[in-house]
């Protein structure tokens, strides 16, 4: 399993996701631009001392990612999806992509991947 963060903005969020990736043996893929430097204290604080064990790859944009992973099955996590993540069967080589905190995944990408858009239900207070 792979996690993709598309243009993440908050270093602590990325650090926490990175720590979870280490704990689960999941690869992390970061698509630029990032809203922070990977050497910032806040990302290291969130990732604690696990960050050095993380298998992380950076890409200059989503096209760069696609060219380096042709044929990858990418699930788009979006509040706009009809299908809930529990409705699908994930494979060990699948990717789940999350968009930037302020805006989500760009609409043009969601249109391109409309068949693999999934929603993670949230309480209405979020």
Region spans (language model):
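Post-transcriptional modification and biogenesis factors for structured RNAs
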Residues: 1-126
């Amino acid at each position: 399993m792979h996690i993709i963060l598309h243009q993440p903005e908050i270093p602590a969020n990325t650090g926490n996701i990175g720590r979870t990736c280490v704990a689960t043996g999941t690869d992390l893929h970061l698509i630029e631009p990032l809203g922070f430097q990977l050497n910032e204290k806040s990302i290291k604080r969130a990732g604690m001392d696990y960050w050095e064990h993380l298998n992380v790859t950076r890409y200059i944009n989503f096209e760069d990612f696609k060219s380096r992973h042709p044929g990858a099955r990418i699930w788009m996590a979006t509040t706009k999806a009809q299908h809930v993540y529990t409705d699908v069967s994930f494979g060990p080589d699948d990717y789940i992509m999350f968009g930037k905190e302020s805006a989500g995944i760009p609409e043009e990408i969601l249109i391109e991947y409309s068949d693999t858009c999934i929603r993670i239900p949230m309480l209405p207070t979020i």
